[in-house]
Structures are given as structure tokens and as C-alpha cells.
UniProtKB/Swiss-Prot annotation:
It comes from the Eukaryota. Chlorophyll a binds at M685, Y693. Phylloquinone binds at W694. PsaA and PsaB bind P700, the primary electron donor of photosystem I (PSI), as well as the electron acceptors A0, A1 and FX. PSI is a plastocyanin/cytochrome c6-ferredoxin oxidoreductase, converting photonic excitation into a charge separation, which transfers an electron from the donor P700 chlorophyll pair to the spectroscopically characterized acceptors A0, A1, FX, FA and FB in turn. Oxidized P700 is reduced on the lumenal side of the thylakoid membrane by plastocyanin or cytochrome c6. It comes from Phaeodactylum tricornutum (strain CCAP 1055/1). This is Photosystem I P700 chlorophyll a apoprotein A1.
Length: 752
């Protein structure tokens, strides 16, 4: 029988959702631990509450159905988006209702941003410092004001509307999370359709996202910012929609608008170069990247991503197949190459998450560096407190995401990896020579650690002996970072060849002139010397040790010479049972636990380096005669070459603001500094003591309760080894980060 074209088309249409998959039951949700038969019985011991928290989001432990796990993750993503939109709404509401945004717009260099006013209840109104522009409030360092300026927002009313829009989106996302789990739940094959997912994410999310952003920048942000830069008062600038509907108004600012779309369809795209520019450098009025460069950048990205979103094969039989690409990827020394990876990435969400976390973490760290080297928003470069906050924020996020990537890679190895399906592919070959990888990485860590700290110990010793001529320094035995200086020079000179029409360098960090806004330095060439060379090798050391610990946790997740059957013990286990001494702290979870301490070390050194370097060699003022005065007077090169210098000239010297903050608007930072130190010290109680100690203590406390006929119905238990470590780690990181935050903010607010 001949099949008509209509019939053939209908065969392509597949039903990818299941209707009314799971009943909506508030009664079920109200029962703690409803997702687990054991937990649903209720608590018998205090361990129950810990297991409840540990397993609530461990969907693997709740069901063996990959489809059900996929649906739960998908629904949870909508919940996450709902929270994000609610947060964005709250930020804009604060800007609309509690902020000095309008005043800041009139004088962004001298007026500080504030979007929170503390109520006078028991004297906390002391926190409302004078931020300028007849406004008292807490100085914020989030960068929202600069971003709003870049978007073309000129009044608090517009912030109100965005806040309302954010609330609406939050509600829609919440509804979508419920709808796509309970009413129309996608089937497993929908989640596993990698080609369709790539097309939609590339063309839809990234492509159309970039296109809509560049459209907003061209039609709304550019004209408004051009008028603001020219000194027009915000209240005199037309409303955003007028630039959209009034071409005459736009063509006064950008003459090519009068020509409409004719240049586009005739191929004379150069006509649009008045608003799609390739200038390079920074806008001298605002100290930020040229918004017309940013619009051009996003338009180009939109074109690339929309093209990329048509690359993969779906219903039409043309384009790439992800499986074919992966399986064709093999060389003479790589065995089966990438064979089997497609199956891993479509059946293990832990494998997907591991890659995505590693990528997003790396991207966050890249963003941290771009924020100061190429400041994207108007007046953000001269707001030193915000620059320091954003750098620190993105570095911490990057560190946590990369560590999380290793955690989920290890969970994948334990729960989802099937050796038989990966025989002689790249993953299998890496696992087979893991001893060589870890041994070499261990050697690198020892080399870097001994040499990097050796430089400092040498310098501290020579300084103590009064022999400055024998120290490693720019004035004695030089250790110049010649490769870094060479790369800086290449980046400074290359645009002259690769982008001959650009007006300035990509980033003034590489070289060039000093960019100042209102007498404050926005950016200038960052000179590198011996002190940078030395601390760079501390960075290399701490990062390599973090990688060593995390990679060992992944490569030995399933087995090791010590514990051959490790895969059977799971992702987290305290020891390999009684009678096997020396097997504690060998689970993949324990590797993540240890790796997080080293991640904390790594990021701390990076943010300390950044903070001191920028205050010493970049941030400061420039007088009309061109003389530059840096905040700490260029003391990094001399102070950062000894351990004592780091302690005295950075930590102790710059802690004066937080230590002496009492009775001032910065006093909250003094309290946080003390409180966070306490939280950090509290963590040591969990990290340095064993479970038996606490169980014995609990037994005696329970005995006392029994004597008074006051015994609890739920039996108290000491935390397990793993639980104790988790609590200790959480407080260690929270305390450490809180201490650093208070130290940085009290200092930064005083110098900006």
C-alpha cells in the first residue's frame, strides 16, 4: 500500500509527554521523608533529620527510573528559575523603593550606590552612612546601578515595572515546574534527544538571547547612554518606547537609522557603523567598554549561535549526529576513542552535570578577570569596592562549581559507569594509567610547593639577616615573569595587525595609556614583576594540589589497590568496615571534602593577590598635571615578596578599617568579622574530634535526663564521621568566606 506524504509526515510526529503523570498531593508533601520508605516511618534517633537532608534531593536513592529522575531534575530547574526571578525582582524593587539611583545617575563618580536603609529600632541606624547626594544608607557593591545605567534605565519607576515583571516570571516558572511534572511530564526520549536539545539551546537560548539583548542595546540603551554621556539630565531623556517607535528621534543620534533596512538588504552593512562599532578600549566618559562595541559583539554572537543551532540532525535527515561525531573521534594512540561517551552523556545526568559545572566554574573565573581588565558597564571601573566584590564573588563561585564538577564526576563513576560499555575507549584508557597520572601530578605538586614556598622562606630569612641584596626582588636577584610580560606585549601589539581599524587596545591591562574618570583611575597598564612571579607559583601550587585531590577521587572512585571493591561501598563511606584498618577517608566524598579545603586556599590567595595588587599598582587618583597616586603607594612589589610582608603590609595593615569600625557606619563589618571568626573556629570542634568522644558525652547527658524522668522520645546519636566532617567543612568555609568578606568590604568601602 502506498503511503501518502501526509501519512509519512504524521509518522514523524512523536508524542513526547505523558499526561497526568503524578498526582498532586499536599497530604503526601506534608509528610516528612515521603520520598523514602525508611524515612517516612518517622524519627527513632536524631540521625533521621540528617538523613532527611542528605537524601531529599538525591533522586537516585528515591527511584531507579531514569525517566522519573529526569522529570524531577527538570521540574527542580523551573523551581530554581522561579527563585532567581524572585531574587531579581527583589533587587529591582530595592532599587525602586529604597535606593538613591536617581541621585547616583547625576554624579556616578562621587555619589556611592545604596539600595537599603536600616530602620531605627535599637540603634542600628548607625549603619546608614552618608553615601552622598543627601542620602544615608548602606553602601552596596553589587554593580546593579552600573548595569541599570548600561541598560538605559533612567528612573525608579522603570525599576518598579521590572520588579513586577520579575514577580510575574517567577510565578510562571513555579507553575511550569508543577505543570511539567504533574500534568504534562516529558518522556525519557525527550530528555535524551541531544540533537534537538543542542539546536534549541544554541539557536533559542543563546542565539535569540544575544539577538534580543543586542536589539535592546541598539534601540534603547545606546541612545539613552549617549544622551547621559553628553550630560543630559535623566528626567529630560525621552522614555524608552519613544526610541523604539520614533525613527526621527533615533536618526538625530545615529544618522544611519534614517536609511532603515535598505543597507542591510543591499549588503552595505558598513552604513550601520555609527552604532555597531569596533573601537576597542574604554569610553573616556564612563570608563566602561563602548556600548556600541558591546551591541556589535552580541549581534555577531547571535548570528554565530543561530547558525550553530541549525547544525544538528533532527527530523529532516541533514546535519550532524552527536553519536557519529563522537564515535568517529579516534586517533592512532587512543583505542576506541570516544566510543561509548554518547551513551554516558544521555543516561548519566551526573556525567552531564560534572562537565557543565567544570565549564561554568571556569567561565565564572574568566568573567572575574574580564570584569576589571575590560570593565563592561559605565562607571564600574572607578567603583573600587564593587570591582573587588565582583572579582571575589565570581572567583568563589568558580571554585565551588569546579569542585562540584569533580564531585559529580565521582558520583557518575560510582553509580552510572559500566566498564563493559567503555572497553578501551579514552575514559577506560585514562582509568588504566591513573597511577601514572596521579604520581606525576603528585611530583608536580611537590616541586611547585617546595620551590614556591622556598622563594618566600629565602626572602624572609635574608630580610631578617639584613641582606636585602641577596633577596629575590626587582632591585636585587630578579625573577621577572618574562613569559607573562611577553604575552602582555603580544596582546598590546596584535590588534594593530588583526584589527587595524580599532582605535585602542583590547584591554589597558596589557599596556597603553591611563584611563581616568573624574580624577579616579579606571584602568591602566598592570606591570608585572618578581612579586607577581612568586605569588603566581603559589597559585600554581594550590591549584595543582586541588586538582590532585579531586582527580584522585574521580579516578579511584570505583576501586584502588587498597580497596578493590570500592564501587560497592558507594560514593560516601567512612571506612571499609571493622577489621580493615587504614581504609578511612578514602571514599570519593572524602576526596571532595579535602579538595574543598584546598579550593578555599587557592581562591583566598587569588583574591588577596588581586586586592593588594590593584590597590598598589592600579587604583588611585591622577592629578591635572598627570601625577598618579595609588592607594597603597605601589608597595606590592616590595611587600609581597616575603611571608612577613603579606602578614604585615596586607592583612594587618588593611584590617585596620574592620578592626576600628565600631561606632561607625561600617560597624556591621566589625561584628561580622568577629562572628565569622567564631563560626570558623567552631568548625574545628567538628574537624578535630572523633565520634566516640561525642557519643560518650551524649550517654552521660541522657543518663542525667533519665534520672530526672525527662528522657527524650527520639534517641540522641552523635553525628556519623561523614556528617561531622560535612558540618565542620560547611562552617570552615562559611566562617572563612564571611571573615574575608567583612575584611574586604570594610577596607573597600573606606577607599572607594
Amino acid at each position: 500500500m502506498a503511503i501518502s506524504s501526509t501519512d509519512r509526515r504524521s509518522k514523524n510526529v512523536q508524542i513526547f509527554v505523558e499526561k497526568d503523570a503524578v498526582e498532586t498531593s499536599f497530604a503526601k508533601w506534608a509528610q516528612p521523608g515521603h520520598f523514602s520508605r525508611t524515612l517516612a516511618k518517622g524519627p527513632k534517633t536524631t540521625t533521621w533529620i540528617w538523613n532527611l537532608h542528605a537524601d531529599a534531593h538525591d533522586f537516585d536513592s528515591q527511584t531507579s527510573s531514569l525517566e522519573e529522575v529526569s522529570r524531577k531534575i527538570f521540574s527542580a530547574h523551573f523551581g530554581q528559575l522561579s527563585v532567581i526571578f524572585l531574587w531579581i525582582s527583589g533587587m529591582h524593587f530595592h532599587g525602586a523603593y529604597f535606593s538613591n539611583y536617581s541621585a547616583w545617575l547625576t554624579d556616578p563618580v562621587n555619589i556611592k550606590q545604596s539600595s537599603q536603609v536600616v530602620w531605627p529600632i535599637v540603634g542600628q541606624e548607625i549603619l546608614n552612612g552618608d553615601v552622598g547626594g543627601n542620602f544615608q544608607g548602606i553602601q552596596t557593591t553589587s554593580g546593579w546601578f552600573q548595569m541599570w545605567r548600561a541598560e538605559g534605565i533612567t528612573s525608579e519607576v522603570e525599576l518598579y515595572w521590572i520588579a513586577i515583571g520579575g514577580l510575574a516570571m517567577s510565578a510562571i516558572m513555579l507553575f511550569a515546574g508543577w505543570f511539567h511534572y504533574h500534568k504534562a511530564a516529558p518522556k525519557l526520549e525527550w530528555f535524551q534527544n541531544a540533537e534537538s536539545m543542542m539546536n534549541h539551546h544554541l539557536a533559542g537560548l543563546l542565539g535569540l538571547g544575544c539577538l534580543s539583548w543586542s536589539g535592546h542595546q541598539i534601540h534603547v540603551a545606546l541612545p539613552i547612554n549617549k544622551l547621559l554621556d553628553a550630560g543630559v539630565a535623566p528626567q529630560e531623556i525621552p522614555l524608552p518606547h519613544e526610541f523604539l517607535i520614533n525613527r526621527e528621534l533615533m536618526s538625530q543620534l545615529y544618522p544611519s537609522f534614517s536609511k532603515g533596512l535598505a543597507p542591510f538588504f543591499s549588503g552595505h552593512w558598513g552604513e550601520y557603523s555609527d552604532f555597531l562599532t569596533f573601537k576597542g578600549g574604554l569610553n573616556p566618559v564612563t570608563g566602561g567598554l563602548w556600548l556600541s562595541d558591546i551591541a556589535h559583539h552580541h549581534l555577531a554572537l547571535a548570528v554565530l549561535f543561530i547558525f550553530a543551532g541549525h547544525m544538528y540532525r533532527t527530523n529532516w535527515g541533514i546535519g550532524h549526529s552527536m553519536k557519529e561525531i563522537l564515535e568517529a573521534h579516534k586517533g592512532p594512540f587512543t583505542g576506541e576513542g570516544h566510543k561509548g561517551l554518547y551513551e554516558i552523556l544521555t543516561t548519566s545526568w551526573h556525567a552531564q552535570l560534572a562537565i557543565n559545572l567544570a565549564m561554568m566554574g571556569s567561565l565564572s573565573i574568566i568573567v572575574a578577570h574580564h570584569m576589571y581588565a575590560m570593565p563592561p558597564y559605565p562607571y564600574i571601573a572607578t567603583d573600587y569596592a564593587t570591582q573587588l566584590s565582583l572579582f571575589t564573588h565570581h572567583m568563589w563561585i568558580g571554585g565551588f562549581c569546579v569542585t562540584g564538577g569533580a564531585a559529580h564526576a565521582a558520583i557518575f563513576m560510582v553509580r552510572d559507569y559500566t566498564p563493559a560499555n567503555n572497553y578501551n575507549n579514552l575514559l577506560d584508557r585514562v582509568l588504566r594509567h591513573r597511577d601514572s597520572i596521579i604520581a606525576h601530578l603528585n611530583w608536580v605538586c611537590i616541586f611547585l610547593g617546595c620551590h614556591a614556598f622556598g622563594f618566600y622562606i629565602h626572602n624572609d630569612t635574608m630580610r631578617a639577616l639584613g641582606r636585602p641584596q641577596d633577596m629575590f626582588s626587582d632591585k636585587a636577584i630578579q625573577l621577572q615573569p618574562i613569559f607573562a610580560q611577553w604575552i602582555q606585549n603580544i596582546h598590546l601589539l596584535a590588534p594593530g595587525t588583526t584589527a587595524p581599524n580599532a582605535l585602542a587596545t583590547t584591554s589597558y591591562a596589557f599596556g597603553g595609556e591611563v584611563v581616568e574618570v573624574g580624577g579616579k583611575i579606571a584602568m591602566m597598564p598592570i606591570q608585572l614583576g618578581t612579586a607577581d612571579f612568586m605569588v603566581h607559583h603559589i597559585h600554581a601550587f594550590t591549584i595543582h594540589v586541588t586538582v590532585l585531590i579531586l582527580l584522585k577521587g574521580v579516578l579511584y572512585a570505583r576501586s584502588s589497590k587498597l580497596i578493590p571493591d570500592k564501587a560497592n561501598l558507594g560514593f560516601r563511606f567512612p571506612c571499609d568496615g571493622p577489621g580493615r584498618g587504614g581504609t578511612c577517608q578514602s571514599s570519593s566524598w572524602d576526596h571532595v571534602f579535602l579538595g574543598l579545603f584546598w579550593m578555599y586556599n587557592s581562591i583566598s590567595v587569588v583574591i588577596f593577590h588581586f586586592s593588594w595588587k590593584m590597590q598598589s599598582d592600579v587604583w588611585g587618583t591622577i592629578s591635572p598635571d598627570g601625577s598618579i597616586s595609588h592607594i597603597t603607594g605601589g608597595n606590592f612589589a616590595k611587600g609581597a615578596i616575603t611571608i612577613n610582608g603579606w602578614l604585615r603590609d596586607f592583612l594587618w595593615s588593611q584590617a585596620s578599617q574592620v578592626i576600628q569600625s565600631y561606632g561607625s557606619a561600617a560597624s556591621a563589618y566589625g561584628l561580622i568579622f568577629l562572628g565569622a571568626h567564631f563560626i570558623w573556629a567552631f568548625s574545628l570542634m567538628f574537624l578535630f574530634s572523633g565520634r566516640g568522644y561525642w557519643q560518650e558525652l551524649i550517654e552521660s547527658i541522657v543518663w542525667a535526663h533519665n534520672k530526672l524522668n525527662f528522657a527524650p522520645a527520639i534517641q540522641p546519636r552523635a553525628l556519623s564521621i561523614t556528617q561531622g566532617r560535612a558540618v565542620g567543612l560547611a562552617h570552615y568555609l562559611l566562617g572563612g568566606i564571611g571573615t574575608t568578606w567583612a575584611f574586604f568590604l570594610a577596607r573597600a568601602v573606606s577607599i572607594s
